[in-house]
């Protein structure tokens, strides 16, 4: 046994004594002598060559305390499990910012919000967000190779994996909903088993079946339980001969921002199809549809306003697009039909009722402002000026405080509130009155929506024209 406690010298390379260690024997070393290592600094007896590294010494001793399982290059399942645990943090961000679960429906801003989350999650630096100036459809259509060219180094594969995972989860959810709602009990009441078939069975009357892409627009926009809408997942097969001459399938115009085809088929009790309006994707698309707005001002539609997006999101709820029907009555008629008269001292236009009437989901900022403006007790801090639909924030901080309280946002202030108001400018919902501080005007067709003229509403509230310049 030598100084290093090695019994069998055949296990080490024949190098100079001062460099002997536990290295395995390699034939190449047999041809060299100790002069080969003369260029290296001298080593003390205690600082001998280290053992051949196994990689185990690089593992942290506290790895057992990690939340994620230990990754190994050969374990794809473990890697996938770890990535899913990391990606789950984005779901909370989606709820906070109102980002749709389906990446195909993302706006350009929501793509940016996803990348900002990844930048923070993976501590990325020098990320050029301008390279991803595209909406969700364009992002999903890039393909992996093109995506990796645009993505930051070293994390492109991870981001692509996350994107694929979200798309897959959305498709699986869509397929599950289709399975649950493809029974005959979920179709319109005028259809029975003798008139409509689903699946891949051959149509006996020769009507050609047409398949529609799975994970398409309708599944994320219209509730699957809507009794009068046929899901795009369902394969329309046949009607009996007696009805073939009177039945036609109509297609709704869809913004190019969305993939796939959109089939909406509505009928009345006699079996004759009627028109159905094309839904819009919330804040992602404010383009007006003629069929949806034929009784509205052509400039805008309050039905399109799903949320006010910002990095300080006003909405907690996910703003998935809703299947909105064109209103057939005014809000005033709607209230009267509900036999729900306005109580004394209460707002004439309750925001929650207005949200239900328009089908916008969570209460929106413009609806909340109308509630305050129709409440006599709020006239000390917000009121109509008496000039049409113009209104003034006499105490903008109080308005912001109440909006924050309604949406459970304690840090809400007028700066953030005004950011939401500015978002309405381009959508022709609300405009700022030039030359007047804290004065705004509704420029959409509120009269058709509410069923009140400005003068009628002012009379109910006892509003006097504002003579202040």
Curated annotation (Swiss-Prot):
Record feature DNA-binding region, as residue ranges: 363-443
Q: Which UniProt keywords apply?
A: DNA-binding, Nucleus, Phosphoprotein, Proto-oncogene, Transcription, Transcription regulation
The record's Gene3D superfamilies line, in alphabetical order, gives: Transcription Factor, Ets-1, Winged helix-like DNA-binding domain superfamily/Winged helix DNA-binding domain
Modification after translation (UniProt): Phosphorylation by CDK10 at Ser-220 and Ser-225 creates a phosphodegron that targets ETS2 for proteasomal degradation.
Q: Does the keyword Transcription regulation apply?
A: yes
**BP GO annotations:** cell differentiation; ectodermal cell fate commitment; mesoderm development; negative regulation of transcription by RNA polymerase II; positive regulation of transcription by RNA polymerase II; primitive streak formation; regulation of transcription by RNA polymerase II; skeletal system development
Q: Which SUPFAM superfamilies match?
A: SAM/Pointed domain, Winged helix' DNA-binding domain
Compartment(s): Nucleus
List residues, modification Phosphoserine: 220, 225, 295, 298, 301
The record's PANTHER family line, in alphabetical order, gives:
ETS (PTHR11849), PROTEIN C-ETS-2 (PTHR11849:SF188)
Q: What is this protein called?
A: Protein C-ets-2
Specify the species.
Homo sapiens
Its taxonomic path starts at:
Eukaryota, Metazoa, Chordata, Craniata, Vertebrata
């Amino acid at each position: 046994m030598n100084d290093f406690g090695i019994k069998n010298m055949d296990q080490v390379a024949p190098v100079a004594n001062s460099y002997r260690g536990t290295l395995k024997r390699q034939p190449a070393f047999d041809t060299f002598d100790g002069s080969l290592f003369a260029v290296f600094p001298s080593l003390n007896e205690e600082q001998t060559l280290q053992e051949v590294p196994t990689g185990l010494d690089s593992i942290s001793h506290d790895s057992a305390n990690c939340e994620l399982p230990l990754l190994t290059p050969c374990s794809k399942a473990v890697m996938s499990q770890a990535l899913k645990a990391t990606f789950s943090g984005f779901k909370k961000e989606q709820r906070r910012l109102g980002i749709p679960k389906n990446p195909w429906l993302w706006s350009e801003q929501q793509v940016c919000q996803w990348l900002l989350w990844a930048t923070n999650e993976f501590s990325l630096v020098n990320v050029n967000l301008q390279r991803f100036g595209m909406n969700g459809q364009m992002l999903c259509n890039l393909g992996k190779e093109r995506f990796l060219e645009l993505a930051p180094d070293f994390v492109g594969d991870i981001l692509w994996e996350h994107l694929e995972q979200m798309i897959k989860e959305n498709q699986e959810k869509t397929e599950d909903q289709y399975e649950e709602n493809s029974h005959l009990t979920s179709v319109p009441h005028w259809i029975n088993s003798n008139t409509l078939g689903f699946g891949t069975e051959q149509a006996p009357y020769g009507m050609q079946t047409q398949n529609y892409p799975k994970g398409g627009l309708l599944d994320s926009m219209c509730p699957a339980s809507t009794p009068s809408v046929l899901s795009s997942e369902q394969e329309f097969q046949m009607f009996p001969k007696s009805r073939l001459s009177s039945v036609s399938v109509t297609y709704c115009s869809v913004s190019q921002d969305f993939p796939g085809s959109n089939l909406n088929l509505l009928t009345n009790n006699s079996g004759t199809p009627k028109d159905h309006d094309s839904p819009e994707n919330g804040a992602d698309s404010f383009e007006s549809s003629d069929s949806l707005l034929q009784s509205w001002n052509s400039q805008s539609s309050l039905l399109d306003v799903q949320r006010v997006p910002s990095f300080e999101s006003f909405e907690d709820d996910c703003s998935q697009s809703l299947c909105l029907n064109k209103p057939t009555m005014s809000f005033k008629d709607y209230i009267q039909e509900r036999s729900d008269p306005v109580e004394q001292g209460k707002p004439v236009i309750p925001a929650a009722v207005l949200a239900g009437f328009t089908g916008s989901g969570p209460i929106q900022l413009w609806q909340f402002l109308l509630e305050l403006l129709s409440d006599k007790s709020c006239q000390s801090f917000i009121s109509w000026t008496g000039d049409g639909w113009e209104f003034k924030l006499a105490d903008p901080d109080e308005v912001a405080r109440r909006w924050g309280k309604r949406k459970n946002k304690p840090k809400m202030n007028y700066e953030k509130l005004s950011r939401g108001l500015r978002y309405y400018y381009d959508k022709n919902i609300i405009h700022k009155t030039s030359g007047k501080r804290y004065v705004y005007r509704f420029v959409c067709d509120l009269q058709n929506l509410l069923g009140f003229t400005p003068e009628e509403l002012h009379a109910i509230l006892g509003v006097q024209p504002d003579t202040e310049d």
